[in-house]
Design a protein with these regions (language model features):
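Substrate-binding cleft of carbohydrate-active enzyme catalytic domains
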Residues: 1-143
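Charged, low-complexity surface patches
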Residues: 8, 127, 165-166, 267
Length: 374
């Protein structure tokens, strides 16, 4: 039987040692209970209804997630984490917790029984229970959990967990968590997501990013651990494309993470020198004319990315009618997040996608970005 790519334990150790020699710490992430489609494709019984699920060939948010009502779910997680924790020396372990639709949980007899036994009425609190069970497993191995800020929708999240703030959709509970002493890493998608093109997250925007939640800055808070730029690879076609997305934006976030932002023109001048050196080493940096796209160039940069993400034929997107129907709720949700209500119907028509993107981006010129100039 053929399998996809994997690392042996010795290869993992080699990567960890290689990174450590360069003063880099590798922290593993196994996202759960959502973003587990591959896990469920291999072990269908871990989902609510145990239905066979094909391994998906494109990214998205899917309704089939791990079932917190089944004891075998936690038995599997314990075996998995026991093996993986032993490989990574750092005391932090990321368990995700983001984008976990409760659609199947609401129909699942196992979840219903679990909620009744625990006296729960809110499915977010069922995820909170799931998180606590996984955190308890990690603690047995001397690990501290890192979670996306979605998990704060459940009550009384342990401040021993580290929260990674990525989305304003679930920002309301973040200030209270910080006030209770909880530690937060800032990775706001509106500036620090580097799979987004420069037309969405420009170099200027990254350089002026501030850790603001609900209108309050946490730049001086002792509970703000720092920044982390994220780059998800579903839409990254080649190593050269990866490097173009990273540099010089990674220079910007490195500078502001260790210091306050200074004069942007001075930073740009230094960035030019850095990419000259990097280019001589074979690194494919974004050229200066692409750092801060304006006008139609900015709009086209963003529109191309969105069209690439959502249209059949793009990297990691559904190619058949059946696949497109399977991911349709994800596309509709994405459209509702990024577009005006009147654009959503047009989003579902392939030939009008870029037009809708153009209309949307024209509504938000760079000077209106919340992070610019702060």
């Amino acid at each position: 039987k053929e399998y996809g790519g994997f690392y042996t334990q010795d290869q993992i150790r080699d990567v960890i040692n290689y990174a450590a020699e360069r003063h880099i710490t590798i922290i593993p992430e196994i996202d759960m209970p959502g973003h587990t489609r591959s896990m469920i494709a291999a072990y269908p019984h871990l989902s609510c209804f145990g239905e066979k699920t094909e391994l998906c060939q494109f990214g998205g948010i899917f309704e089939k997630i791990l079932c917190p009502g089944k004891d075998e779910t936690f038995e599997f997680i314990e075996k998995l984490l026991t093996e993986v924790c032993a490989l990574f020396p750092d005391d932090r372990f990321h368990i995700g917790g983001d984008e976990a639709p409760k659609t199947e949980w609401k129909k699942c007899p196992h979840c219903k029984a679990r909620m009744e036994a625990l006296g729960l009425t809110d499915y977010e609190d069922l995820q909170g229970y799931f998180t606590k069970r996984v955190v308890a497993i990690l603690k047995k191995h001397g690990k501290r959990a890192v979670c996306w800020n979605d998990v704060l929708e459940s009550k009384d999240v342990d401040t021993g967990n580290i929260i990674q703030y990525w989305t304003a959709q679930h920002e309301a509970p973040v200030p209270a968590f910080i006030e209770r002493g909880g530690k937060v890493i800032f990775s706001n998608m509106s500036a620090l997501y580097f799979d987004y093109p420069h037309g969405i997250n420009s170099l200027n925007k990254v350089y002026h990013y501030q850790p603001v939640v609900m209108g309050k800055s946490y730049a001086d808070s002792p509970n703000m651990l720092g920044y982390e730029a994220a780059l998800w690879s579903e839409q990254v076609e080649t190593p050269e494309h990866l490097e173009e997305l990273l540099f010089p934006r990674l220079y910007a976030v490195s500078e502001i993470a260790w210091n306050e932002a200074g004069d942007y023109a001075d930073f740009e001048h230094r960035a030019e020198k850095k990419i000259e050196i990097a280019a001589k080493q074979g690194v494919n940096c974004m050229t200066k004319d692409g750092w801060n796209p304006e006008g139609e160039a900015r709009v086209q940069s963003a529109a191309t990315f969105i069209a690439h993400m959502m249209n059949p034929g793009g990297i990691g997107t559904p190619h058949t009618d059946a696949e497109r129907e399977m991911v349709r709720p994800v596309i509709e949700k994405f459209a509702q997040i990024w577009f005006r209500p009147q654009d959503v119907p047009e989003m579902m028509k392939n030939d009008d996608l870029v037009g809708a993107a153009l209309n949307f981006m024209k509504m938000f010129p760079p000077e209106n970005d919340e992070t610019k100039g702060k």
